[in-house]
Swiss-Prot record:
Start and end residues of each stretch annotated as 6 X 5 AA repeats of [FM]-N-P-N-M-Q: 163-264
2 X 5 AA repeats of F-N-P-R-M: annotated segments: 186-226
Region (Disordered): 114-149, 163-280
Name assigned to this protein: P32 adhesin
UniProt organism field: Mycoplasma genitalium (strain ATCC 33530 / DSM 19775 / NCTC 10195 / G37)
Compartmental location: Cell projection, Attachment organelle membrane
InterPro entries hit by this protein: Cytadhesin_P30/P32
Major localisation: membrane
Coiled-coil features, chain-numbered ranges: none
Amino acid sequence: MELNGFLRYKKLFIVLALLFTTILIVSLSLLAFALVVKTNGSELGVVFHQTEDNTTVIQGRSIVEQPWFIPTVAGSFGFSALAIILGLAIGLPIVKRKEKRLLEEKERQEQIAEQLQRISDQQEQQTVEIDPQQSQAQPSQPQVQQPLQPQFQQRVPLLRPAFNPNMQQRPGFNQPNQQFQPHNNFNPRMNPNMQRPGFNPNMQQRPGFNQPNQQFQPHNNFNPRMNPNMQRPGFNQPHPNQFAQPNNFNPNMQQRPGFNPNMQQRPNPSQLMPKGGLKP
């Protein structure tokens, strides 16, 4: 407890120590200043001594023999003692008050902890009264050694009542319908009443349906892929007195102005010889 009080109120002890140190330093500095002044400026502190050689020696008195030595030392010690007494007189009551407050707070926390413990005990008693079986000790279960590898048990399929082989069929269930008998040349998967008339093999063809058109007969020297009514005169037709021109050239077609068909092809610039003074 004393250690915790010292750690919590260390600021107070630091202030008291600084006060005591300040008073001590002030008293010692006053003592040193007085010694210096008395030694250097006092005329009464000079003593003449005559030796055997009839020579005079000037010596000063020692500090202890000075008349101000005793009062100065006594005053410095008095200030130090006064600082210690004041520090203890001020600090001790404050520390005692703080310790007393800490003790009261600790007792209060202990009381609160006891009350909480009582409340928890009462709640446990109520739960035990409501369900006494929980308070009984459960028997220890025997330890069973488990295999290292898992064992898979075979599952037995459950038979539903609809799949019972001994169960008789219900009337009208999964019975063939006598009205829908299979027809000749008919797929049994298709209902004959749903057959369209266009798919009846015994039905005659309608006139004009899927019959070749007699008006569009193939012409001589004509591509069968092209409609003859769409052929234009003088288009891609060979001349009877001339040979066939390459690239389907029509001789009856007028030439465009400025276009010479006999003009030779210009040479490729990349195939020309390099000229002098130019980089290749």
